[in-house]
């Protein structure tokens, strides 16, 4: 049999097991929490790592647990050659209120596995595991150092993979399997900054609430003139914090502060901050508020900025600080994460893209996205799958997607991801040999 015939045989032989194991992993509610387990991200994230560890050992793969932050997986010990890391994660975001199905039941409905994290990123994790296990099962030698890494804190800062890379070192190339095929050749930069100003006398408190895994908070509660109000996320109110602070009522003590802050809230491209920018590869700067806090004197708003790949993120930080000095607002930089960009002509990016297009008779192009994945932590890397960019899921509006209600992964898209990862691993290994 040739390679593709072996892949088809492998998928046919293991299809029920692949679905069953994916369902089993989905049943673990691996949401990052602080508990008394002694594990860095809580007992459930640790259980997910243990599950993956056991499954890998059943497949005769070699594993190393990096203190329950990451699990490293290889075909054999003492691998040599260039190093490829394929990174996925077992942690998930918290559930939402409007699920139709139990988010941690891990059940199949029609052609879909439904449950929290099955798209982001447990399905892709299982796909990468079975892709590497294919080489072990069929005795196909890999000449280079091919590793999987399963993380536990991708959704809350990615310090898990940082911890791993500090100890294991950077690979020659890294792949993040955390979006759609064919290839993600860049991610926008990220800056979080806060603005504080004295609150108006009639404002007792304004605070927003949400999980640390979800960017924009789900609720904004305020007490003004003794009257309590809670604004929640609805179809019409996408951002409760923005809705609260763009109403008719003045919330800040000084008229000038109110004016400046309303300008920022209304300026989604960052013009008033001096950071508006556009490039053909990644689009334009985006700015949005996502959190509100208050104390006895001040209101603090925290904003998320996504920057095009050609905009120097250090310049963005400098301009934010300069804006604070110019306006008298208290500006603090909360978080900075540099994006990345690989030219579409990069030999691995182009090879993987062509591989996908050939396999599916498509004409897809590499793309840049605003979301953050493990790919940005590699000195050299990109995203590679594992979703279908044209899939239309048979669920109600707002259901079926990553981070949403009733997250759902098509079983055949999952099998396609395994096939593409096998082909991708083999192509990179051959190229490096």
Question: What role is predicted for each listed range?
Answer:
Residues 125-135, 164, 224, 378, ...:
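Buried hydrophobic packing segments
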Residues 90-92, 146-158, 177-182, 388:
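Acidic, glycine-rich active-site loops and adjacent beta-strand->loop/helix elements
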Residues 2-113, 142:
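Acidic/His- and Gly-rich active-site-bordering loop/insert found
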Residues 10-17, 21-28, 51-59, 134, ...:
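Generic non-transmembrane alpha-helical segments
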Residues 57, 62, 81-150, 397-400, ...:
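Active-site metal-coordination/substrate-binding segment of hydrolases
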Residues 155, 161-314:
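Midchain, well-structured core segments that form catalytic/ion-binding scaffolds
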Residues 10, 295, 353-357, 362-431:
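Zn-dependent metallopeptidase/amidohydrolase metal-coordination segment
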Residues 249-250, 288-293, 302-309, 330-349, ...:
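A short beta-alpha structural unit
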């Amino acid at each position: 049999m040739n390679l593709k015939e072996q892949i088809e045989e492998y998928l046919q032989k293991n299809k029920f097991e692949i679905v069953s194991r994916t369902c089993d992993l989905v049943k673990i509610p691996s949401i990052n929490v602080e508990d008394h387990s002694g594990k860095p991200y809580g007992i459930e994230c640790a259980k997910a790592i243990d599950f993956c560890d056991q499954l890998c050992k059943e497949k005769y793969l070699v594993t190393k647990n990096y203190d329950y932050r990451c699990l490293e997986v290889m075909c054999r010990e003492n691998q040599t050659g260039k190093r490829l890391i394929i990174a996925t994660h077992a942690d998930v975001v918290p559930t939402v209120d409007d699920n139709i199905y139990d988010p941690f039941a891990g059940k199949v409905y029609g052609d879909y596995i439904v449950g929290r994290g099955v798209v982001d990123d447990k399905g892709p994790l299982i796909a990468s595991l079975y892709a590497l296990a294919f080489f072990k099962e069929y005795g196909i030698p890999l000449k280079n150092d091919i590793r999987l890494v399963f993380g536990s804190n991708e959704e809350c800062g990615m310090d898990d993979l940082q911890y791993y890379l500090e100890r294991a070192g950077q690979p020659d190339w890294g792949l993040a399997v955390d979006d759609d095929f064919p290839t993600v050749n860049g991610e926008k930069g990220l800056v979080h900054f806060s603005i504080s100003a004295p609150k108006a006398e009639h404002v007792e408190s304004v605070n927003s609430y949400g999980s640390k895994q979800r960017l924009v908070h789900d609720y904004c509660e305020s007490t003004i003139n003794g009257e309590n109000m809670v604004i929640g996320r609805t179809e019409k109110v996408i951002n409760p914090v923005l809705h609260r602070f763009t109403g008719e009522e003045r919330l800040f003590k000084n008229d000038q502060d109110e004016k400046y802050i309303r300008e920022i809230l209304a300026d989604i491209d960052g013009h008033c901050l001096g950071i508006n920018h556009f490039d053909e590869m990644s689009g334009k700067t985006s700015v949005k508020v996502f959190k509100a806090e208050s104390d006895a004197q001040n209101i603090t708003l925290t904003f998320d900025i996504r920057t095009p790949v050609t905009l120097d993120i250090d310049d963005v930080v400098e301009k934010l600080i300069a804006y604070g000095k110019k306006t008298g607002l208290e500006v603090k930089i909360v978080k900075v994460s540099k994006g990345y960009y690989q030219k579409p002509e990069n030999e691995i990016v182009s090879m993987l893209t062509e591989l996908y297009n050939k396999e599916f008779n498509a004409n897809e192009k590499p793309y840049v996205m605003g979301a953050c994945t493990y790919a940005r932590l590699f000195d050299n890397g990109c995203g590679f799958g594992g979703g279908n960019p044209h899939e239309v899921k048979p669920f109600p509006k707002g259901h079926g997607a990553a981070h949403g209600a009733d997250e759902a992964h098509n079983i055949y898209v999952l099998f396609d991801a395994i096939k593409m990862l096998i082909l991708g691993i083999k192509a990179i290994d051959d190229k490096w040999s």
